[in-house]
Amino acid sequence: MADQDIRIRLEGKATEGDVTALRNWLERERPLEDLLRDGRVRIRERPATAHDGTPMGTSQEIVIAVTSAGATVVFQELLEQVRRGVRAWRDNRRAVEDGEPPQGRVEPVNRHDG
């Protein structure tokens, strides 16, 4: 599983601010916060790409990568934790801002596929 990442894409009318807000939210979610602090995972933003690696306009996505130090991280558990974190962020955004928050798609991706 060390060659798989977790990709998060916000769909619909998501803004760069939404992507950054979600990343900040995830960085404070337990146990992701602990895994980040211990260097077992990394979270980064990057331009969204299609399956063939070509850029998809100006949209951004978030990628969570398990590092070699985090090789013992159980990938499916991490994937479910990220999904719960995205749901919690959407619930919070709905409570503090007008309008429906963008949908989030969380999926595993092979590292070499982008």
Question: Where would I find each of the regions flagged by the language model?
Answer:
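Short amphipathic alpha-helical segments that predominantly mediate membrane engagement
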Residues: 1-64, 78-114
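Short, glycine/alanine-rich hydrophobic alpha-helices that insert into or span membranes
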Residues: 65-76
